[in-house]
Amino acid sequence: MTTVRTRIAPSPTGDPHVGTAYIALFNYCFAKQHGGEFILRIEDTDQLRSTRESEQQIFDALRWLGIEWNEGPDVGGPHGPYRQSERGEIYAKYAKELVDAGHAFYCFCTAEELEQMRAEQQARGETPRYDGRALLLSAEEVQRRLDAGEPHVIRMKVPSEGICVVPDMLRGDVEIPWDRMDMQVLMKNDGLPTYFLANVVDDHLMGITHVLRGEEWLPSAPKLIKLYEYFGWEQPKLCYMPLLRNPDKSKLSKRKNPTSVTFYERMGFMPEAMLNYLGRMGWSMPDEREKFSLAEMVEHFDLSRISLGGPIFDIEKLSWLNGQWLRELPVEEFAARLQKWAFNSDYMMKIAPHVQGRVETFSQVAPLGGFFFEGALKLDAKLFESKKLSADQVRQVIQLILWKLESLRQWEKERITGCIQAVVEALELKLRDAMPLMFAAITGQASSVSVLDAMEILGPDLTRYRLRQALDLLGGVSKKENKEWEKLLASIG
């Protein structure tokens, strides 16, 4: 009997996302319920954004939750390497096989040509897609260009008509017209694969039998199915999981909800409660109980109990469930966990240099730096009153800085400062006009340790959470303001 093998394949391009943890949990439970194996693979082909620091954060976040893997970059295994950036020769080999078999082709189109193609198609009211012009090149012309070292990509051929049937373990057969599919790039001009080729090759070579992934990938499933057909490989069983949603039913995003697992760890949530809550996202125990452990979820896991309605990720409900877990701890364990959370040595070492020079006794540390150990702050609206800025301008400054910080890929003091500086310059203000607002929102005080250092230490999710909290206190942002300010944001460098 074939061993069930599932996997999670996150990209190390930022803080570990709760959506990644959610999909990892369901893959883990499915594998373990069937006595199988769970694999961790790192999709780091985006060399500009991928970092080893983010990769380590993924490892740490999953392990904090209690999710372990049988094979992966840090534990090894018989199907490595487990980082896609280390598998370049493998992908090149299989891409060449597709070209030789007539299932893929070399494309030498420049970015300018592709942009013109898209513009012309849009002008005609057509859906932009590659028009296949490289297929008209003769074999001799293709070879001449390859020999000359012209930049190129490899694209897959797709049918122009007919229906692809996607067998989904949750929805049954899903029919998707082939005319919605583009001639997908498989190998980029930097020699690295796109998601589609790497995903299929890796899942096959690693013996993955079942793939549970987010439903946002369902519309592009025909491309993956066609690649399996081209290679002559057996396709894993597919399951497209419902996406996590904000309370307003929109897709879970950092603009409306803290999305980093690290944020919830920093806020003092228990990993058991976090995992329990993620397990309730679209799934339920047979007896409908709300509180259950990972072991209990594995024991009773059944895909048929997954609801297709978008599960709502609500921090208030998570907090309630976390309270249930906390209050049931033995007092000794509660105290031990509290001490471990509050006096994390690595975190304390980040904070200590910024408070040591400003206190005369240890008892003064808490009033000065207590905000480092809090989640939501009790903010005072008076702290946001400005002699120079109107109430509307105050909200505008905070909102624009929040938006700029949301696009920040590397969370460093210099880059945080750059975001704030860009906003104040665009509004023809001075840095000193904005910094009191940052002190008020981030520390809950009129002054404290360097707020820029504090923002770097607190991290992106907690910083953005507090800025959103400040905006809510000040009345929020109207739809009209949101539209006007987003236009202004687009003009800020």
Swiss-Prot record:
A motif ('HIGH' region) lies at residues 10-20. PROSITE patterns: AA_TRNA_LIGASE_I. Its EC number is 6.1.1.17. One of its GO terms (cellular component) is cytosol. It is an enzyme of class 6 (ligase). It comes from the Bacteria. This is Glutamate--tRNA ligase. It comes from Pseudomonas putida (strain ATCC 700007 / DSM 6899 / JCM 31910 / BCRC 17059 / LMG 24140 / F1).
